[in-house]
Amino acid sequence: MTSSPVPVQTDLRPVLSRLAKGEHLNEEEAFAAFDLIMRGQATSSQIAALVMALRLRGETEAEMGGAVRALRSHMIPIKAPDGAIDVCGTGGDGAGTLNISTAVTFVVAGCGIPIAKHGNRALSSRSGAADVLTALGVQIDLGTERQEAILHDEHCAFLFAPHFHPALRHAAEARSQLGIRTLFNLIGPMGNPAGVKRQLTGVFDPIWAAPMARVLGELGTETCWIVHGLGLDELTLAGESQVTALENGSLRQFSVTPEEAGLPRAPLDTIQGGDADHNARVLQALLDGADGPYRDTVCLNAAAALIVAGQTGTLKEGVALARRSIDDGSALSALNRLRAATNAIP
């Protein structure tokens, strides 16, 4: 991924004209176009036209790489504890499940792994990470310095994207009005402001797994799993999931099944979610010890996160650690500590 200077883009219309002809942008051109968006120099109509043109024609790895670089160039960075990871998904899968990665956050934190959970409110679903955390009583509207302090003190924090990526406000109206997945869904998980070197990322379409892993590697990520499970941006209990792993500078692609982790299969409808309040109640019940497919799904994904974190080497061992985190109250304690820290008067 080149870091050569790029021309300053001052008007998105020439780019739109090229895309209308079916042309591709190279990485530097994509950087310039998205940099213009981040600087507030494109209208909502132009932004919507750009991301829809890319989606209809098919986004390229170079375009994704340039867009990620633009996103990162405008973010407010913080420093994470050593060994910190992120667990998130692109969204946009349209499945309407319970919040998986948010629950995984507390299970993994309960295992002693620092976790800088990066996320937003729902844009193309009913309940995003920010929505369910708010319903759980976690205060997300905190300054970046306060969140950095919480991350270091509690080893668990939610990095609310609008606070760390203020430039994305210029695209908010277009994204909300479109209400569908776009390139922004792909680049969001690659813009963790804490600069984590390890992450578990779910993707709405497995075609993007290898490109995302390569781009993350070029941006300094050491280990990541990009996962997709039968339409979900998560590992699933419903059948076989696809994984693209970046490890030691190399990509490895493989599939995993619930049986490999020692878990029973369960259909997708067993983890159907609702609004933020409903999903928060179910997540709280999970941390309080409730059993069932939701717990198993969370444990499966937590196991993957623990492998990425270097805590274990197999899914079966990871599931055992995840179950212990829930059963001994460590996961619940992680939520309670985060809730208390974010609501404390500084």
From Swiss-Prot:
Q: What is its EC number?
A: 2.4.2.18
Q: Which pathway does UniProt place it in? A: Amino-acid biosynthesis; L-tryptophan biosynthesis; L-tryptophan from chorismate: step 2/5
What organism is recorded for this protein?
Granulibacter bethesdensis (strain ATCC BAA-1260 / CGDNIH1)
- Give a Gene Ontology cellular component term annotated to this protein: cytosol
Tell me the protein family, please: Belongs to the anthranilate phosphoribosyltransferase family.
Q: Quick one: which residues bind Mg(2+) 2?
A: 233-234
The protein's annotated catalytic reaction(s) are: N-(5-phospho-beta-D-ribosyl)anthranilate + diphosphate = 5-phospho-alpha-D-ribose 1-diphosphate + anthranilate
Task: Output the NCBIfam families linked to this UniProt entry.
Answer: trpD
Q: What is this protein called?
A: Anthranilate phosphoribosyltransferase
